[in-house]
Amino acid sequence: MELRVSNTSCENGSLLHLYCSSQEVLCQIVNDLSPEVPSNATFHSWQERIRQNYGFYIGLGLAFLSSFLIGSSVILKKKGLLRLVATGATRAVDGGFGYLKDAMWWAGFLTMAAGEVANFGAYAFAPATVVTPLGALSVLISAILSSYFLRESLNLLGKLGCVICVAGSTVMVIHAPEEEKVTTIMEMASKMKDTGFIVFAVLLLVSCLILIFVIAPRYGQRNILIYIIICSVIGAFSVAAVKGLGITIKNFFQGLPVVRHPLPYILSLILALSLSTQVNFLNRALDIFNTSLVFPIYYVFFTTVVVTSSIILFKEWYSMSAVDIAGTLSGFVTIILGVFMLHAFKDLDISCASLPHMHKNPPPSPAPEPTVIRLEDKNVLVDNIELASTSSPEEKPKVFIIHS
């Protein structure tokens, strides 16, 4: 049996969590029998105080770091894929794996791995509804770096779209819940047995298999949404696995018996399969389509699926007020509008320098003066007939009847 204290000391009114196998019991101290406080209880209360006071901000900082690393990794991986195309090797979209021999691609992969580790920690300390929308920062970083290092165009409207994405993410962070609803691996296992989540997971898995084996071979190279939707749907499983493993690590250092629980091993297998699938199809999308187009659309779909999964699995929105729910939804819609501006107007040549020279309607060119020919001016008509016949001798002669 494991014991964990939820308050700073074992005073009257303090709460005790008792764990026995997969069961949890919450007890309250109603009378002091001894003035001494066990050292073990003091240690756990210190951990609980750190989690309650600083856990949200630690998760927020790790999410910022993760966004920067992931946004930079896309550029490095794209440069590796471009170098692969220059050598004439089989492209990733055609089933080639030549990028595995490229140092630039591996640099991008390791950078992405570091970003995912930071993301891993962020999900362990903060709710998924907070961490996931901060991926908009990686959209901003990826779009800006691609314009400098990949020579991909990013006009004024695209930059404005990036700013709108960041503003929407800020609104979501302000209104998102700060308290986690699942704090132990036993609670995670109980949530995953819920009927609503099981139905949701089965629907995602079936749709993903249809996309991979039926739709992607036919339309994947022509439609950018196919590969991106596959990565986004798989992302729901990877985020749930990351969240569960993060909770497992925290519980391990808290002294809970997580090693004997089967769920961490199942989540590790799910994470390995989902990440490998995501990397494969994201490489195919980056190999064909523009980076500044792939990453924003991927962010919108990925965030939508993950937030929906978090609502169903972790029930993070159940304790939120109507104002916070409306603010979170408004922030997400703002992000979608920013992403739309980022890729819908990417081909327009608009910059700050060109704005003063743009006119609503160009000035009309002066109309030519009409030539007036009177009916009685027979000499002019005859001259026109002669000029027409001499300029194009191959044409058949035309007969004009002049009425006097």
Swiss-Prot record:
Residues on Extracellular side: 1-55, 124, 175-195, 245-261, 315-324
Species name: Homo sapiens (Human)
Pfam families tied to this protein: Mg_trans_NIPA (PF05653)
Name this polypeptide is given: Magnesium transporter NIPA4
SUPFAM superfamilies, A to Z: Multidrug resistance efflux transporter EmrE
Residues on Cytoplasmic side: 77-102, 146-153, 217-223, 283-293, 346-404
One Gene Ontology term of the molecular function aspect: magnesium ion transmembrane transporter activity
Function of the protein: Acts as a Mg(2+) transporter. Can also transport other divalent cations such as Ba(2+), Sr(2+) and Fe(2+) but to a much less extent than Mg(2+). May be a receptor for ligands (trioxilins A3 and B3) from the hepoxilin pathway.
Keyword Aminoacyl-tRNA synthetase appears in the UniProt entry: no
Family label: Belongs to the NIPA family.
Catalytic activity: Mg(2+)(in) = Mg(2+)(out)
InterPro entries assigned to the protein according to its UniProt record, in alphabetical order: Mg_trans_NIPA
GO biological process: magnesium ion transport
Tissue-level expression: Highly expressed in brain, lung, stomach, keratinocytes and leukocytes, and in all other tissues tested except liver, thyroid and fetal brain.
Compartments (UniProt record): Cell membrane
Glycosylation-annotated residues: N7, N12, N40
Principal location class: membrane
Pathology noted in the entry: Ichthyosis, congenital, autosomal recessive 6: A form of autosomal recessive congenital ichthyosis, a disorder of keratinization with abnormal differentiation and desquamation of the epidermis, resulting in abnormal skin scaling over the whole body. The main skin phenotypes are lamellar ichthyosis (LI) and non-bullous congenital ichthyosiform erythroderma (NCIE), although phenotypic overlap within the same patient or among patients from the same family can occur.
Topological category with respect to the lipid bilayer: Multi-pass membrane protein
GO CC terms in record: membrane; plasma membrane
Segments traversing the membrane: 56-76, 103-123, 125-145, 154-174, 196-216, 224-244, 262-282, 294-314, 325-345
Keywords of the record: Cell membrane, Disease variant, Glycoprotein, Ichthyosis, Ion transport, Magnesium, Membrane, Receptor, Transmembrane, Transmembrane helix, Transport
Source taxon at top rank: Eukaryota
